[in-house]
Amino acid sequence: MNKFWDNVLRFPRFLVSVILGLILIIISPFFVLLKKPLTSFFFIISLAGLITVLAIIIQKMINIECC
């Protein structure tokens, strides 16, 4: 019975390692963009614009008025 619980306890660790690996693989191309100043500038501006647009859309969806 101990072997069973040992195997069951391995799955959460495996899940965490898979998720972290996936996140690192997805994010790694963006680190290459941040090495050059020009692409870094456009990447940061694009990211700020994306966050702003998403915030506005979510505020409109749930009918929140701020400022």
Curated annotation (Swiss-Prot):
UniProt xrefs under InterPro entries: Uncharacterised_Ycf33 (IPR008470)
Pfam families: DUF751
Cellular component, GO annotation: chloroplast
Subcellular location(s) per record: Plastid, Chloroplast
Presence of keyword Chloroplast: yes
Keyword terms: Chloroplast, Plastid
Family note: Belongs to the ycf33 family.
Name of the protein: Uncharacterized protein ycf33
Organism of origin: Pyropia yezoensis (Susabi-nori)
